[in-house]
């Protein structure tokens, strides 16, 4: 699932990071890849009376670096786009504009994106993975095994959403990884939510370092009490 409040703060602080002075500087684009809503949040180890929050923003990010472009997370299934609120089993999903269209608005075609890294392989992070045909997937070894060798053992994995990545080139990681070799974009291993959950450190030229923390936490309370 998607952590919400921490990501919302990042959006306020970061937005689309573009340096007006240097065309080749590192840029981070924040994209809206859907929304989830819940009638019962106890599945997140938080009781319903501990917070009034019931909706979660689903973000995707595009990192534009002089050495390549990295899509971080792929949001909800684009089949939801234009369908309004879809409700099932106490959860609703809404998705208004596909990540592919948002990437095009930034100035890239989906087939120009050359790297993809997903915080983890749950359905709300892999929805559009099949629509970026030329990416090299950067994935932790444990997550790769769970997603491609035993997806039926992981009920929130939806293999159909990322099956086209099976034959894509991959970099199988066993821990942290410097994506572009300059320390500016670092994948950090953070297992727990899934076997190979990972987070992304980005050091932006104007606003400095931040962490895109995937589903490390879902609520402020989760972070404060380490739930």
Please tell me what each predicted stretch does.
Residues 13-124, 136, 140-191, 207-214, ...:
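Metallo-beta-lactamase
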Residues 4-13:
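Bacterial N-terminal signal peptides
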Residues 37-39, 79, 121-127, 145-146, ...:
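Active-site environment of divalent metal-dependent phosphoester hydrolases
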Residues 72, 119, 139-140, 192, ...:
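Active-site flanking residues adjacent to catalytic metal/cofactor-binding acidic residues
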Residues 130-133:
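Short, conserved loop/helix-junction motifs that constitute active-site signature segments
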């Amino acid at each position: 699932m998607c952590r919400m409040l921490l990501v919302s703060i990042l959006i306020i602080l970061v937005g689309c990071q573009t340096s007006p002075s240097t065309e080749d500087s590192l840029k981070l684009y924040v994209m809206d890849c859907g929304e989830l809503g819940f009638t019962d949040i106890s599945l997140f180890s938080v009781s319903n009376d501990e917070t009034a929050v019931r909706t979660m923003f689903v973000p995707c990010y595009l990192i534009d670096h002089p050495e390549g472009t990295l899509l971080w997370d792929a949001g909800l299934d684009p089949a939801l786009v234009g369908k309004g609120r879809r409700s099932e089993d106490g959860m609703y999903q809404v998705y208004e504009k596909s990540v592919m269209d948002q990437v095009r608005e930034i100035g890239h075609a989906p087939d120009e994106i050359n790297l993809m890294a997903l915080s983890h392989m749950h359905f709300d992070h892999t929805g559009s993975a099949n629509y970026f045909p030329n990416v090299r997937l950067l994935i932790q070894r444990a997550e790769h095994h769970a997603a491609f060798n035993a997806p039926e053992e992981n009920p929130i994995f939806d293999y159909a959403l990322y099956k086209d990545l099976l034959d894509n080139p991959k970099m199988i990681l066993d821990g942290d990884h410097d994506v572009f070799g300059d320390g500016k974009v670092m994948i950090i291993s953070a297992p727990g939510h899934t076997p190979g959950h990972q987070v992304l450190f980005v050091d932006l030229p104007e606003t400095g370092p931040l962490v895109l923390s995937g589903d490390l936490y879902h609520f402020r309370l989760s972070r404060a009490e380490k739930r």
